Amino acid sequence: MTPISQTPGLLAEAMVDLGAIEHNVRVLREHAGHAQLMAVVKADGYGHGATRVAQTALGAGAAELGVATVDEALALRADGITAPVLAWLHPPGIDFGPALLADVQVAVSSLRQLDELLHAVRRTGRTATVTVKVDTGLNRNGVGPAQFPAMLTALRQAMAEDAVRLRGLMSHMVYADKPDDSINDVQAQRFTAFLAQAREQGVRFEVAHLSNSSATMARPDLTFDLVRPGIAVYGLSPVPALGDMGLVPAMTVKCAVALVKSIRAGEGVSYGHTWIAPRDTNLALLPIGYADGVFRSLGGRLEVLINGRRCPGVGRICMDQFMVDLGPGPLDVAEGDEAILFGPGIRGEPTAQDWADLVGTIHYEVVTSPRGRITRTYREAENR
């Protein structure tokens, strides 16, 4: 990797290394074996930028893309993405017409959603490419066992009318980080039972997919025809207890030091003076805060990397700024120097997992949080 450097003119940035995305997709493809790979780019690519991630993932061998909503899929189409895209989370009363006209695949979780989709088929004259999402134990969206026979009947009728192309059967796993938990086996058995029931009723799906990131990496027996990794695409380990699993985190959040100042022992810092300097020391002001995704609960707990060394945050994190302690003595930090809040960790900087551990959350929330005055930038992929 090349050294990180601050982009001129930016207050702060979330730099996304597309080479890391490329690497991660190739690692996932190796684990997927014979199965195809659907890269999940919902929530604007987990905060990394859906379009650029999608382009990179497809170039690295992903066959399809997955998103939560039709609007997310349409945004990819507007940006020129022509690969298969599946959307699976829909509010009541949605107009599926734009999805059909843009060749977006639709996953339905209920007969009501299928009815709404068929209404759009009749209006537009376009055949719908349909996946059925079944509930195997997560108890969110998905067709349950009691409703599945009626769904199969409705699908047979729709196929007889050439209203739908039946593409897939999918479900979602309870555990994102425990590939060996017994509920995974229970879900696989239930999923297989759904497939068998469909075959008995003369309904055949082109593909079946259950595996999330952790199953893709650690449960080859759950592969089926397609794997559907999300967080691992972005280089964050789906099973932190197992280390990085060969993945490379793609996001680095950094900003410029806005101000350097000295204070005396006994002086307080930031709102409420929750930190009192125990000695004469030097401080650096960083010009982003909780409005930009730096969690307020990290106040007095986080560290940042400046000029190769970790500096602790002191005092409360404010809406648009916070302070770090540079320590006493001669200054080795100047205004304009780069401060890395989190990144892959290869330079000694904190990682997204470090932040998650500090505030009792998951790294998913950390990387989807940068916003406001943090500008997303990209490092293009290089030959690795």
UniProtKB/Swiss-Prot annotation:
Catalytic activity, EC: 5.1.1.1
Complex formation: Homodimer.
Taxonomic lineage from the root: Bacteria, Bacillati, Actinomycetota, Actinomycetes, Mycobacteriales
Cofactor: pyridoxal 5'-phosphate
Biological or metabolic pathway of the protein: Amino-acid biosynthesis; D-alanine biosynthesis; D-alanine from L-alanine: step 1/1
Pfam family, one: Ala_racemase_C
Naturally occurring in which organism (per UniProt): Mycobacterium tuberculosis (strain ATCC 25618 / H37Rv)
Protein name: Alanine racemase
NCBIfam families, per database record: alr
PANTHER family membership: ALANINE RACEMASE (PTHR30511), ALANINE RACEMASE, CATABOLIC-RELATED (PTHR30511:SF0)
Inhibition and activation profile: Inhibited by the antituberculous drug D-cycloserine (DCS), which is a structural analog of D-alanine.
Tagged with keyword Ribosomal protein: no
